[in-house]
């Protein structure tokens, strides 16, 4: 009886070591508060760029999308991403040859992305 209990106790670690390890396909996220984007270009929102952005994008957003004054609500320390497309860590993160950014859910069909922060993906 003692031999059966001992065998059962010794068998548990052996079975645990024999279990195959499943590799993780996801990596720790650097983009917790938005979406991961690959943008053709990005610009800071300093005074000169902000005036250009308000002129070009403000007119475009106001005229086409009915979102005039949107750039006044954007954090001045964040980036504006231009011509962005969403990427995923698993799928095509290494295919972004331009600027990889994390944008706070302000994507207008890839035209612009507001509230972005640059991130580095090394997979």
UniProtKB/Swiss-Prot annotation:
GO terms under cellular component: extracellular region; fungal-type cell wall
Query: Which segment of the chain is annotated as a signal peptide?
Result: 1-18
Q: Which GO terms describe its molecular function?
A: structural constituent of cell wall
Disulfide bridge positions per record: 31-102, 38-96, 39-84, 103-116
Q: Which UniProt keywords apply?
A: Cell wall, Disulfide bond, Glycoprotein, Secreted, Signal
Glycosylation positions in this chain: 33, 40
Localisation: Secreted; Secreted, Cell wall
Matching entries from Pfam families are given as: Hydrophobin
InterPro entries registered for this protein in UniProt: Hydrophobin (IPR001338)
* Family recorded in the similarity comment: Belongs to the fungal hydrophobin family.
Q: How does it assemble?
A: Self-assembles to form functional amyloid fibrils called rodlets. Self-assembly into fibrillar rodlets occurs spontaneously at hydrophobic:hydrophilic interfaces and the rodlets further associate laterally to form amphipathic monolayers.
Q: Which function does this protein serve?
A: Aerial growth, conidiation, and dispersal of filamentous fungi in the environment rely upon a capability of their secreting small amphipathic proteins called hydrophobins (HPBs) with low sequence identity. Class I can self-assemble into an outermost layer of rodlet bundles on aerial cell surfaces, conferring cellular hydrophobicity that supports fungal growth, development and dispersal; whereas Class II form highly ordered films at water-air interfaces through intermolecular interactions but contribute nothing to the rodlet structure.
Q: Identify this protein by name.
A: Class I hydrophobin pri2
The organism named in the record is: Cyclocybe aegerita (Black poplar mushroom)
